[in-house]
């Protein structure tokens, strides 16, 4: 890669239609896990103008009012007016859940015992990533993209910009020099708004109140291109503007394109699904490797076969930044982390109703107490084993 290049990532707000679907799916998962932590859940959601469809496979002893959970989620997001195209009070909610296939269940149904050889719920490959670009050990473009739409939502909720509506998208382009962030090049922010705000007022307010307070001062160099609602009017949005589906924002959910993605979405899936749990474990491993000072950038890939507990492969790539060899780091990963599906569930305490919070503004790089995969509690042990100096601010 050239010494001087541009890299871009995007994010979307909690009111984006695909994120509405993700949050409903994870709210339903949480409601089920709160009653029956051994449930098997694959909850998919479709949302359109005035309509929500709940489908998928659920096997549980829990008694959940799925329709009310969906309505409560839509209300929390802010769709409480028919003018927005969907209103939690009046939208239709259709429920079409089935049970998990017994052919799949036979490989993973030992969840209740202490046998760590519970098989993976499906085949697949998952990636974890960490780097030193931010204190959270995340790539800077996706980190800033998340913070922009999160700030847009906060300003909407507290009434400082009362003409904002729930749907929004952000995109940040960063200039890199010698592989490190050097300056912000372009910021795009498109936000849904009420029809009575003029475009000039909107653009000035978004730049001054949303964008500028979010950008790191040391990366504001020269002329930054601010593109706010570049097509102009954005009144029709959310599920009215586009049909929303669970699992369509997998790059937003992870590393903004800075790392590969195995293709499996997260939301609506209980932790027996390695699409979710192994991706969380991958982040946990990669973050601890970087926090331990073993490398300044780390990618890990793991893969699984359905019904088989042990990963079919574990790969570590530090892109030439390793203080020890990638082979040594791979060995340390296998010694310090249990990457069997049930081992991951126990290691990260995943049988809890913690997932709705993850369904907007990124699953990674957020210091939420429930997000155990963001802990760097293995960093000191890894550093001691490898003979490196841990990142002092991160090693616990």
Swiss-Prot record:
It is found in: Cytoplasm. K(+) binds at residue 44. GO terms for biological process: one-carbon metabolic process; S-adenosylmethionine biosynthetic process. GO terms for molecular function: ATP binding; magnesium ion binding; methionine adenosyltransferase activity. Its EC number is 2.5.1.6. L-methionine binds at residues 57, 100, 242, 273. Residues 100-110 are annotated as: Flexible loop. One of its GO terms (cellular component) is cytoplasm. It catalyses: L-methionine + ATP + H2O = S-adenosyl-L-methionine + phosphate + diphosphate. Transmembrane segments: none annotated. Its cofactor is Mg(2+); K(+). ATP binds at residues 16, 167-169, 233-234, 242, 248-249, 265, 269. Binds 2 divalent ions per subunit. Binds 1 potassium ion per subunit. It is an enzyme of class 2 (transferase). Belongs to the AdoMet synthase family. Catalyzes the formation of S-adenosylmethionine (AdoMet) from methionine and ATP. The overall synthetic reaction is composed of two sequential steps, AdoMet formation and the subsequent tripolyphosphate hydrolysis which occurs prior to release of AdoMet from the enzyme. Homotetramer; dimer of dimers. This is S-adenosylmethionine synthase. It comes from Paraburkholderia phytofirmans (strain DSM 17436 / LMG 22146 / PsJN) (Burkholderia phytofirmans). The lineage of its organism: Bacteria, Pseudomonadati, Pseudomonadota, Betaproteobacteria, Burkholderiales. The gene is metK.
């Amino acid at each position: 890669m050239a010494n001087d290049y541009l890299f871009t990532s995007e994010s979307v707000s909690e009111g984006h239609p695909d994120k509405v679907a993700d949050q409903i799916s994870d709210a339903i998962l949480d409601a089920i896990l709160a009653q029956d932590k051994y449930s098997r859940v694959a909850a998919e959601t479709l949302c359109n103008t005035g309509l929500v469809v709940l489908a998928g496979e659920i096997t549980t002893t829990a008694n959940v009012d799925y329709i009310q959970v969906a309505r409560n989620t839509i209300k929390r997001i802010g769709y409480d007016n028919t003018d927005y195209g969907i209103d939690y009070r009046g939208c239709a909610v259709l429920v079409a859940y089935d049970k998990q296939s017994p052919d799949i269940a036979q490989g993973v149904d030992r969840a209740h015992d202490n046998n760590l050889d519970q098989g993976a719920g499906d085949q697949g490959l998952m990636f974890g990533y960490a780097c030193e670009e931010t204190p959270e050990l995340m790539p800077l473009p996706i980190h800033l993209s998340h913070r922009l739409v999160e700030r847009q939502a906060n300003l909407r909720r507290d009434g400082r910009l009362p003409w904002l509506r729930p749907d929004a998208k952000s995109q940040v382009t960063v200039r890199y020099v010698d592989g490190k962030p050097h300056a912000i090049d372009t910021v795009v922010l498109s936000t849904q708004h009420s029809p009575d705000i003029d475009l000039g007022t909107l653009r000035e307010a978004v730049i001054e109140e949303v964008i500028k307070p979010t950008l790191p001062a040391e990366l504001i160099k020269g002329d930054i291109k601010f593109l706010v609602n570049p097509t102009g009017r954005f009144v029709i949005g959310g599920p009215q503007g586009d049909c929303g589906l669970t699992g369509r924002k997998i790059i937003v959910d992870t590393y903004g394109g800075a790392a590969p993605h195995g293709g499996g979405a997260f939301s609506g899936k209980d932790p027996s699904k390695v699409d979710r749990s192994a991706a969380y474990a991958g982040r946990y491993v990669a973050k601890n490797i970087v926090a331990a000072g073993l490398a300044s950038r780390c990618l890990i890939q793991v893969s699984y076969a359905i019904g088989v507990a042990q990963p079919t492969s574990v790969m570590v790539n530090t892109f030439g930044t390793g203080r020890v060899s990638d082979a040594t780091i791979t060995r340390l990963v296998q010694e310090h982390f249990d990457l069997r599906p049930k081992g991951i569930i126990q290691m990260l305490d995943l049988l809890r109703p913690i997932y709705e919070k993850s369904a907007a503004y990124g699953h990674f790089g957020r210091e939420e107490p429930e997000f155990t995969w963001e802990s760097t509690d293995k960093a000191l042990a890894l550093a001691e084993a490898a003979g490196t100096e841990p990142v002092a601010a991160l090693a616990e």
